[in-house]
Curated annotation (Swiss-Prot):
Its main location: cytoplasm. The gene is aspS. One of its GO terms (biological process) is aspartyl-tRNA aminoacylation. The lineage of its organism: Bacteria, Bacillati, Bacillota, Bacilli, Lactobacillales. It comes from the Bacteria. It comes from Streptococcus pyogenes serotype M5 (strain Manfredo). Catalyzes the attachment of L-aspartate to tRNA(Asp) in a two-step reaction: L-aspartate is first activated by ATP to form Asp-AMP and then transferred to the acceptor end of tRNA(Asp). It catalyses: tRNA(Asp) + L-aspartate + ATP = L-aspartyl-tRNA(Asp) + AMP + diphosphate. It is found in: Cytoplasm. Its EC number is 6.1.1.12. This is Aspartate--tRNA ligase. InterPro entries: Aa-tRNA-synt_II, aa-tRNA-synth_II, aa-tRNA-synth_II/BPL/LPL, Asp-tRNA-ligase_1, Asp-tRNA-ligase_1_N, Asp/Asn-tRNA-synth_IIb, AspRS_core, GAD-like_sf.
Length: 582
């Protein structure tokens, strides 16, 4: 029989009609001779009633066989429920069953198919097809579909062209580790799965496409955390002849449309703009969460002359003030914060509390001479807790930025209903890598430097600034973009600044440099992490909740057991040998 509608969409207007429904048995109950079935499909749950006095013995026998997650087809008459269930969208009606067919049986599931089931992450991933039956998960993917639909409509209306770029591409340096794919035809050679379509989308601008977009899968072999996966999806844009501001206007319009259509939220445009330096110095992060205060305070000058060398001789001394919550933190609690601070390079964490109008704590005695000045500068009040870090500016910022976020969560200081977007601009072009012992691109080596700082490509690389912009939402980097280099001479200077010889640059990027000989237009763009965006809209804390078949924190799939061993024949065909490092 043809299904009449989704079970979760039956309403009062259907009372008095005969319909056919198909779905899964969510629950079966026997009460006073009647059998009640909760039938679940992707749109919700509908109550079925099977009365032995009104159905055949065959139907009754079939009903008695039903167990959770059996797949069934039913026909029946829609009636008003005697006792409405306000918790269900279908709670005003029920289906009086006249015909019942079992379409498939099911084993007992390893966990209950309900939103509040307590189950480990790996078990959820091992039985992902069951996990995805939970209503909450279905809603996540409906939301994701709405987001992508909204984005496509918006960009189509602006005459962006949707173009697919290659999945098998060339491995290039200056990024995370590539996933490599050996070539059977060209033995000893490898493709790389793209970390982004960066170069190919730039080449599309050279081809005259003018406006490109793609919702594209990307791959990075990097350590995982809650907002990262080895394969992820991004909304990728590139435009020709537009300024930084024009590109940002397009992106803001796209996000405003998504927010309105998926969350019914009117966001204020334009988004605030914050320089990279302000973000780091005031928030201790290049992706600041602006839903709460507790800004970093620079005390380096204030403490310079005191008789406490830890402070007076430190390159930088900075602090955050936990307002009105000193009594929430015992010595043991602060010790935990100290251990947390050490993860970010700090040697320790100094602190004082304001108790009965005076400083108390291990370093209070060293601050007596400047207590009044500090109190004024930090605007201290009774029961405030001050946390200090004395170290390099970078360590002080990073440590206090991380503490700021942790404490805000611990004290429930964040308004979870807010969606605070902002642009972080005026980025440094390079960042120093202790591991590599050299400067590396803060974004990528195709970013255009500012005209005022480009001369430092042959001088002090720390002074080179980029025409780059990151879009931040609630403390997460949502995406990043820049204007790109379109002049060959500038691109060669950039490669040289990064330590490439001319031969190395030509070997890795010769095709791009050659393309710059053929009228490459000014261009720029941006990419937004779709998984992360949907995660935040769904108010989840892990992107696994919005990816259908994600990997775990070991980059493996407990369901398919990927990655897996392959046969010797397959390795031989690729001229590969596996060496053990045990």
């Amino acid at each position: 029989m043809k299904r009449s509608m989704y079970a979760g969409r039956v309403r009062e207007e259907h009372i008095g009609t005969t319909i056919t429904l198909k779905g899964w048995v969510s629950r079966r109950r026997d009460l006073g001779g009647l059998i009640f079935i909760d039938l679940r499909d992707r749109e919700g749950v509908m109550q079925l009633v099977i009365n032995p006095e009104e159905v055949s013995s065959d139907v009754m026998a079939t009903a008695e066989r039903l167990r959770s997650e059996y797949v069934i087809e039913v026909e029946g008459f829609v009636e008003a429920r005697q006792q409405a269930n306000d918790k269900l969208a279908t709670g005003m009606v029920e289906l009086k069953v006249s015909a019942l067919t079992i379409l498939n049986t099911a084993k007992t599931t390893p966990f209950e198919i309900k939103d509040d089931a307590e189950v480990s992450d790996d078990t959820r991933l091992r039985y992902r097809y069951l996990d995805l039956r939970r209503p909450e998960m279905l809603e996540n993917f409906k939301l994701r579909a709405k987001v992508t639909h909204s984005i496509r409509n918006y960009l189509d209306d602006l005459e962006f062209i949707d173009v697919e770029t290659p999945m098998l591409t060339k491995s290039t340096p200056e990024g995370a580790r590539d996933y490599l794919v050996p070539s059977r035809v060209s033995q000893g050679h490898f493709y790389a799965l793209p970390q982004s379509p960066q170069i190919t989308k730039q080449l599309l601008m050279n081809a005259g496409f003018d406006r490109y977009y793609q919702i594209v899968k990307c791959f990075r072999d990097e350590d995982l955390r809650g907002d990262r996966q080895p394969e992820f999806t991004q909304v990728d844009l590139e435009t020709s002849f537009l300024s930084e501001q024009e590109i940002q206007d397009i992106v803001e319009g796209m996000i405003a449309k998504v927010m309105k259509e998926t969350k019914e939220i009117d966001v204020t445009l334009p988004f605030p703009r914050m320089s990279y330096d302000v973000a780091m110095n005031s928030y201790g992060s290049d992706k600041p969460d602006t839903r709460f205060e507790m800004l970093l305070q620079d005390l380096t000058v204030t403490v310079k002359g005191i008789d406490f060398k830890v402070f007076s001789e430190a390159p930088a001394v900075k602090a955050i003030v936990v307002k009105g919550n000193a009594d929430r933190y015992s010595r043991k609690d602060i010790d935990k914060l100290t251990e947390f601070a050490k993860q970010f390079g700090a040697k320790g964490l100094a602190w004082v509390k304001v108790t009965d109008g005076q400083f108390s704590g291990p370093v209070a005695k060293f601050l007596t001479a400047i207590e009044t000045e500090l109190s004024s500068q930090l605007k201290l009040a009774e029961n405030d807790l001050v946390l200090f870090v004395a170290d390099t500016l970078e360590v002080a910022n990073n440590t206090l930025g991380a503490l700021r976020n942790r404490i805000a969560k611990d004290l429930d200081m964040i308004d979870q209903s807010q969606f605070n977007f902002l642009w972080v601009v005026d980025w440094p072009m390079f960042e120093w890598s202790e591991e590599e012992g050299r400067y590396m691109s803060a974004h990528h080596p195709f970013t255009l430097p500012t005209p005022e700082s480009a001369h430092e490509l042959e001088g002090d690389l720390a002074k080179v600034r980029a025409i780059a912009y990151d879009i931040v939402l609630n403390g997460y980097e949502l995406g990043g973009g820049s204007l790109r280099i379109n002049q060959k001479e500038m691109q060669e200077r950039m490669f040289k600044a990064l330590g490439f010889t001319a031969d190395e640059a030509n070997d890795q990027f010769g095709f791009l440099l050659e393309a710059m000989d053929y009228g490459f237009p000014p261009h720029g763009g941006l990419a937004i992490g779709l998984d992360r965006f949907v995660m935040l809209l769904a108010e989840k804390d892990n992107i696994r909740e919005v990816i259908a078949f994600p990997k775990n924190n070991k980059a493996s799939d407990p369901m398919t057991q990927a990655p897996s061993l392959v046969s010797e024949n397959q390795l031989e065909e690729l001229s590969l040998q596996i060496e053990s490092h045990d």
